[in-house]
């Protein structure tokens, strides 16, 4: 078992395995490989560790790559087991609980599913950052009394983005800005012109320009994530042996905000053999996220009550 820390890891094995059953290792990669070497020399096959921050990830992945069965456990579960003595270290206590089978491993996806989850989580962080930059743009516009949001339902829609890019490019004429109006926009040209008559100040224009540039960067990175997600799904499909029938008609054809930039339904159907979006309330992205978090094999949860 390993007591994971930021600057060092304390490893403990059974006293019958070595004359020095508790050892301390650093956190550099060569330290982690020495830790794995020591476990192998002592005949260790399974290792338990607590999920401490993100510090567990490097040692977990290296041990898995070296062929160990690694159990990631919730620190709360280990602390609530009675009978601990005061003269025993955290690593020794964790090792003893593991030896007697008293630890419950947290579910962690493996292989391509783990990669899929990582790409999806990175994508969500980028979408959240994009929303922050949109708020910064809205603030800059309001400070200049440019009330685009009152005449355009979505400032990041076709009309809104055209107007924002024109402003950043140097256009100030309300008539010229209003000419960017999309034919589907409900507001008339005159109303848009009045809304686009602003108090142009250099510092607010600068903030708008930077927020728009950062938004564009986030969107570019989201597209890059989508490509990684699509490629990962294709690799998962190649590994799966699911019978693929005909894809049923979509329950809804409405495109959701921040939707993934490829046909998620078709990709998931090829992986799973069923269309999860036929379940009421389960859209393409939510189905994709479910697969990314839980994988394609739900045997880790014997029943719905275990799914927490």
Question: Locations of the language-model features?
Answer:
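A detector of single, family-specific signature residues
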Residues: 1-308
């Amino acid at each position: 078992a390993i007591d994971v820390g930021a600057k060092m890891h304390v490893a403990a094995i059974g006293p019958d395995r070595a004359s020095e059953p508790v050892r301390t290792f650093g956190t550099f990669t060569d330290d982690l490989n020495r830790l794995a070497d020591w476990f192998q020399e002592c005949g260790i096959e399974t290792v338990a560790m607590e999920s401490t921050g993100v510090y567990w990830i490097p040692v977990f992945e290296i041990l898995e790559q070296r062929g160990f069965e690694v159990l990631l456990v919730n620190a709360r579960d280990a602390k609530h087991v009675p009978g601990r003595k005061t003269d025993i270290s955290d690593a020794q206590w964790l090792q003893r609980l593991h030896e007697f089978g008293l630890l419950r491993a947290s579910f962690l996806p493996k292989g391509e599913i783990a990669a899929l989850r990582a790409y999806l989580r990175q994508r969500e962080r980028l979408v959240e950052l994009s929303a922050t930059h949109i708020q910064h743009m809205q603030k800059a516009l309001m400070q200049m009394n440019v009330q685009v949001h009152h005449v355009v339902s979505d400032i990041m829609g076709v009309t809104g983005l055209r107007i924002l890019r024109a402003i950043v490019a140097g256009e100030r004429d309300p008539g010229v800005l209003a000419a960017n109006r999309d034919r589907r926009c409900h507001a008339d040209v005159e109303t848009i012109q009045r809304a686009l008559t602003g108090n142009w100040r250099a510092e607010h224009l600068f903030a708008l320009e930077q927020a728009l540039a950062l938004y564009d960067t986030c969107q570019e990175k989201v597209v890059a994530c989508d490509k990684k997600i699509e490629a990962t799904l294709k690799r998962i499909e190649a590994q799966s042996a699911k019978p693929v029938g005909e894809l049923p008609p979509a329950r809804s054809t409405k495109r959701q905000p921040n939707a993934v930039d490829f046909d998620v339904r078709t990709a998931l159907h090829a992986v799973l053999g069923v269309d999860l979006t036929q379940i009421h309330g389960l859209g393409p992205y939510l189905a994709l996220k479910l697969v990314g978090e839980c994988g394609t094999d739900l045997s880790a949860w014997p029943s719905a009550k275990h799914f927490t």
